């Protein structure tokens, strides 16, 4: 017995001597102690957990080389090789926070996101179609956000002192030419595409990604839907027309196809809303589209979208140079657009996105000088009357091929690179009053390569760094455009962002061809943003400065054609923008407020000096409020848009100085417009609904406030006429049905 006790004590003493203490402290990269970190010697049972001070301690009988592991959710796993001998081991360990999508800062300087799933979303997809002043038009909805101008006489997005041609629109990465219906004098046309085609929208008012180019001011980036939730059909009837479509999802939910057709005839709409123009051809539109989508075995997606539209309109308006003559303008348009894309994951962090697009656009435009009996008049003297009789035929073809390769690195870090090739051929035939014809063709081959990296240093600090190189046949020169954005997130989850970039653009088609040697126009963007977002509120303030160089100057030929002559133009735009959205303060009420201050001047085209352009206002603001009353099954939406007066000018040629000078100038009245809409959902609350029905009533400019967009001058500059909307207000009534899918909850959530 004595021997056994002695042996037992010897073993205890040996074990005590053989144990080695391992201790230390674990902190994050900022020195903050981490509680609950699990520490173990790999492939053993020895280990411990840190206390509230980050300290740990354990003993081990292991000897030799081992790997110490430390792990905690939200941080990168830590490993360190150490040698266990006789002496205690003391360690001070610092581990890095794991960069995750839910916690990471969002690089957002210059951009607004509209998506139901994106955590940085400011507007959802349904917001776009329920904003009263937008009339279910994608671009019009973004006019309630800061940075955009309230230009009512011309289509397009006028952003931060830039013209509409300085904003480009992309669908699934490919540039969309003729996104809007063809222009008509003094009337802004709307976009061609249904907003429900898109699952995501990014509106960048500056500093946009190196993946896109040829836009001096902004980019609107649209991403089309993938597979539908289920098979469904839609039907709509309104005062402007009728339309319907179907989306069919396969039984295995791996593919779908869809078609739609819309017919618009504004006879009834114009009967309700009297127009100031005398329409001899009521606007008529035929529009059809088709799509298919296929999910690949590896989870990728192939998407095709095809669109065709044909439309025509014609109207008479008083001629400003005469008290008895009229101008009869007419236009017929045929537009075809096709886009196919393939997105695929190849494993090992590689992703490929490719796209092909092809489109054609044909415009037949005619203008006649007519008398009181609507008979054509050809007046040779004075000569400017003669040029009011003309015909113009435009034929354009566009094609684009594009690919982007993404390589995912550790965490959220990604590097991407790619290239695109863009082909355009635009032919114009101009026929004068005497039958003389002038035909011009402009062909361009634009090639670009680009690269961009998302670098997440921590969850709180990230950068997007990239660049783009382009070569255009028209300019016959290369350009290099660096882009960089940096964002930092504070402890209260607010964040600050900075963006810088160079942006280049070719001259507009209407100023080509030219015999002059020309270069790209260029703009440098500097953007500083502060933003705080919660589930219920969004606040952001953004300051920007934009410097224009090498803007095009133009001159007019004896036939009245304006062409680019040099790149001596320049300009600047600077300002401050505010945005606030609140879904919390008032029960069941969602509202947002935006404000923009803009200081801009430029010398370009035929401007005689550096002046504020006629499409810019110093102050713009918008207020949108929405409330859904479940008891009444009704949603109420109101928007108010405001802008201070815009400048207008009359340029006349001074023979003594051999240049244009300002003959007259002024400012329009302030722009005010309140719009209202009501959505009634009669099926709300019913069970086993197979049909989702919405009645819509919308009124633009409810109060009938006077609006003046600009002024037109007669040839001598002695008379001017205000450019005003076609009607004081517009009343829209429609009924929309969806068969096979219930969107009631979407409609409710959108208004809560």
Model-derived features: positions:
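Short loop/turn motifs that connect adjacent beta-strands in outer-membrane beta-barrel proteins
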Residues: 99, 150, 211-212, 227-232, ...
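Gram-negative outer-membrane beta-barrel transporters
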Residues: 457-458, 567-652, 749
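Transmembrane beta-barrel wall of Gram-negative outer-membrane proteins
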Residues: 240-263, 277-312, 330-356, 409-415, ...
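Flexible loop and strand-edge segments within Gram-negative outer membrane beta-barrel domains
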Residues: 266-267, 281, 299-352, 360-397, ...
């Amino acid at each position: 017995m004595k021997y056994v006790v002695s042996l037992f004590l010897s073993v205890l003493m040996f074990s005590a001597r053989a144990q080695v203490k391992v201790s230390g402290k674990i902190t994050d990269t900022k020195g903050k102690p981490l509680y609950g970190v699990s520490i173990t010697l790999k492939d053993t049972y020895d280990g411990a957990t840190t206390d509230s001070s980050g300290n740990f301690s354990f003993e081990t009988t292991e000897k030799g080389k081992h790997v110490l592991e430390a792990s905690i959710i939200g941080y990168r796993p830590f490993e360190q090789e150490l040698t266990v001998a006789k002496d205690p081991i003391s360690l001070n360990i610092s581990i890095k926070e794991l960069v995750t999508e839910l916690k990471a800062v969002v690089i957002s300087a210059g951009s607004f996101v509209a998506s139901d799933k994106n955590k940085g979303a400011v507007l959802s997809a349904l917001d776009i179609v329920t904003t009263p002043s937008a009339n279910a038009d994608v671009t019009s909805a973004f006019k309630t956000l800061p940075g955009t101008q309230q230009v009512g006489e011309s289509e397009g997005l006028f952003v931060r002192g830039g013209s509409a041609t300085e904003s480009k629109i992309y669908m699934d990465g490919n540039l969309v030419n003729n996104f809007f219906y063809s222009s008509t004098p003094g009337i802004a046309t709307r976009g061609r595409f249904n907003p429900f085609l898109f699952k995501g929208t990014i509106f960048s008012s500056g500093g946009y990604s190196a993946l896109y180019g040829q836009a001096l001011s902004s980019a609107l980036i649209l991403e089309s839907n993938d597979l539908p939730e289920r098979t469904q059909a839609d039907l709509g009837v309104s005062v402007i027309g009728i339309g319907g479509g179907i989306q069919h999802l396969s039984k295995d939910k791996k593919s779908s196809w869809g078609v739609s057709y819309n017919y618009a005839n504004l006879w009834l709409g114009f009967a309700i809303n009297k127009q100031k123009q005398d329409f001899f051809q009521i606007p008529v539109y035929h529009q059809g589209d088709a799509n298919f989508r296929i999910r690949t075995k590896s989870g990728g997606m192939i998407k095709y979208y095809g669109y065709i539209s044909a439309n025509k309109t014609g109207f008479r308006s008083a001629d400003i140079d005469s008290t008895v003559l009229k101008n009869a303008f007419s236009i017929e348009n045929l537009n075809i657009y096709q886009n196919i894309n393939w997105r695929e994951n190849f494993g090992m962090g590689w992703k490929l996105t490719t796209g092909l697009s092809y489109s054609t656009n044909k415009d037949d435009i005619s203008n006649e000088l007519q008398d009181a009996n609507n008979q054509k008049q050809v007046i040779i003297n004075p000569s400017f009357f003669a040029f009011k009789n003309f015909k113009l035929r435009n034929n354009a073809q566009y094609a684009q091929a594009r690919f982007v390769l993404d390589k995912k690195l550790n965490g959220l870090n990604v590097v991407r690179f790619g290239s695109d090739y863009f082909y355009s051929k635009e032919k114009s035939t101009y026929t004068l009053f005497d039958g003389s014809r002038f035909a011009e063709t402009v062909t361009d081959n634009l090639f670009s390569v680009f690269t961009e990296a998302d670098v997440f240093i921590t969850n709180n600090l990230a950068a997007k760094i990239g660049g783009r190189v382009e070569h255009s046949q028209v300019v016959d020169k290369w350009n290099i455009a660096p882009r960089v954005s940096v964002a930092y997130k504070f402890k209260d989850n607010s964040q600050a962002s900075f963006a810088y970039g160079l942006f280049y653009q070719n001259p507009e088609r209407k100023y080509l061809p030219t015999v002059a040697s020309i270069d790209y126009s260029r703009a440098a963007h500097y953007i500083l943003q502060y933003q705080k977002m919660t589930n219920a509120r969004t606040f952001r303030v953004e300051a920007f400065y934009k410097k224009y160089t090498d803007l095009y100057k133009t001159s007019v030929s004896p036939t009245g054609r304006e062409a680019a002559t040099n790149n001596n133009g320049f300009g600047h735009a600077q300002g401050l923008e505010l945005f606030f959205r609140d879904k919390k303060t008032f029960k069941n009420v969602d509202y947002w407020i935006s404000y923009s201050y803009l200081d801009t001047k430029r010398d370009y085209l035929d401007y005689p000096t550096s002046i504020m352009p006629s499409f810019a206002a110093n102050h713009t603001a918008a207020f949108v409020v929405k409330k859904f009353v479940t008891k009444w099954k009704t949603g109420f939406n109101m928007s108010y848009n405001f802008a201070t007066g815009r400048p207008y000018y009359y340029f006349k040629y001074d023979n003594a100085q051999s240049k244009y000078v300002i003959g007259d100038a002024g400012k329009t009245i302030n722009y005010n417009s309140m719009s209202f809409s009501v959505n009634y959902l009669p099926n709300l609350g019913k069970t086993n609904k197979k049909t989702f029905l919405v009645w819509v009533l919308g009124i633009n400019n409810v109060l009938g406030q006077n609006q003046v967009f600009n002024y037109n001058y007669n040839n001598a500059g002695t008379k001017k006429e205000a450019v005003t909307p076609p009607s004081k207000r517009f009343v829209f009534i429609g009924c929309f049905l969806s068969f096979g899918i219930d969107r009631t909850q979407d409609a409710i959530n959108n208004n809560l």
